[in-house]
Amino acid sequence: DAVVDGKPVTGREGYQVEVNALWYNAVRYALELARKSKDTAFVERWEPMPERIRKSFLELFWYEREEFLADYVDEHGQNTFIRPNQIIACSLPYGMLGEGMKRSVIDTVRRHLLTPKGLRTLSPRNPLYEGRCVGDQPTRDRAYHQGTVWPWLLEHYVKACFDMHGKAFLPEARDMLKNFEEDISVSGI
């Protein structure tokens, strides 16, 4: 990712929330395939892992005070900057969060990161927030993960919301799509 003066713009050393959510999903999917193919040795070895992963995930990433997921955890503890990576943990087929936790993450993302064109990479309330990606290359690189809006993250937000709200979310999803009509007609896909 972006590096300025030899240092990462957004250092995320340690355990990242989305990587751990993807790992949990990979293990759960592998177990599903192993059961279907009757690979009992694999199932016996890996069956206890999802619950252990889920428990560790919640202990590491759940930020109890504000009720959302930390972006990453390192030797200094939780990084509680509000970033969009936590929505990935809510959008994957195998979830680790209870309904209340998931609702809280979605609400946090909606309040702090959702825009008509995507999710911000950092909450505007954060002092490191850069609302515009302009200037020379180092300046743009600094802004890249510090507030820039990424449309591709809407997929995860929409999946999480449909999972939480079902068809009741459809009108909001349609409104989100309408926000891209001009972009699609002018620039294409």
Residue ranges and their predicted role:
Residues V4-A21, A70-L97, G135-L153, D163:
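Solvent-exposed loop and edge beta-strand segments that line ligand/cofactor-binding
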Residues G11, E18, K38-P48, G77, ...:
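A structural signal for alpha-helical segments
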Residues L22-N25, Y29, W152, H156-K159:
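Short amphipathic alpha-helical face segments that pack within enzyme cores
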Residues Y24-C133, E182-I189:
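Catalytic cores of carbohydrate-active enzymes
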Residues D107-K117, T121-R132, P138-V149, E155-I189:
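Non-catalytic C-terminal accessory modules of carbohydrate-active enzymes
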